[in-house]
Regions:
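Non-globular targeting/processing and membrane-anchoring segments
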Residues: 1-55, 77-84, 100-110, 124-189
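Aromatic-enriched hydrophobic runs in primary sequence
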Residues: 58, 70-71, 153
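Thiol-based oxidoreductase modules, predominantly thioredoxin-like and allied folds used
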Residues: 58-62, 75, 83-99, 117-119
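Conserved redox-active cysteine motifs that mediate thiol-disulfide chemistry
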Residues: 63-70
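Surface-exposed, flexible loop/turn segments at secondary-structure boundaries
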Residues: 65, 96, 122, 132
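Acidic, Ser/Thr-rich peripheral helices and adjacent loops at domain boundaries
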Residues: 109-119
């Protein structure tokens, strides 16, 4: 995956609120439910609001996927904390086979997979399919299929822990971008 390829995929992606409109009424309800429950703490808002490097964030998702329902709205909330520096888009896994084949996790076409890029679409990191706290919650419950449907929203503690995991990853990428000698030279800082 090079910057040209990623730029094309990003351009074809949809902003969050347009992406969820691709789902059925029930799917849209599930995504809105988690989005409405998700809230950054004041410290998280301040942290994301302090990002100075532009980040491109592309999520490979499935509107039908329970893990996407329970994690993508959290990433959108982070992006909303600094819309001038965090540009987030989503693409459908099944409509982007060429992309997902390059992002296989444990030999599977897992989603969500988040691709973090610099302002010029240079890849900086790939994260998926679940955060550590999401895995802990699933292991504790030991219920349902390997890809839950997102019918029941996560409890508030799980939601907050998973949001914190995603915030850590956004911060890690921002620090990578901020400390990049290539970008520091470009921006003279």
């Amino acid at each position: 995956m090079n910057s040209t390829y990623l730029s094309e995929k990003f351009s074809a992606g949809l902003p969050y609120h347009k992406y969820i409109l691709t789902g059925t009424e029930e799917q849209q309800r599930r995504w809105r439910q988690v989005y409405d429950l998700a809230a950054l703490t004041d410290a998280q808002k301040q942290l994301a609001g302090g990002f100075v490097r532009e980040m491109k964030v592309l999520i490979v998702s499935g509107i039908w996927c329970g893990d996407c329902v329970q994690q993508c709205p959290l990433q959108q909330r982070i992006a909303e904390a600094n819309p001038g520096k965090i540009d987030l888009r989503l693409v459908d896994r099944d409509q982007n086979r060429d992309l997902i084949e390059q992002l296989r996790i444990n030999a599977g076409d897992r989603v969500p997979v988040t691709i973090f890029m610099a302002e010029d679409f240079e890849p900086c990191g790939v994260f998926g399919d679940r955060t550590i706290n999401r895995y802990r919650a699933l292991a504790k419950k030991q219920l349902g299929p390997s890809c839950p449907l997102g019918v029941i929203p996560p409890d508030q503690n799980e939601l907050a822990a998973t949001l914190s995991d995603w915030m850590d990853e956004f911060e890690r990428i921002q620090l990578m971008l901020r400390l990049s000698s290539r970008l520091r030279s470009k921006h003279a800082d």
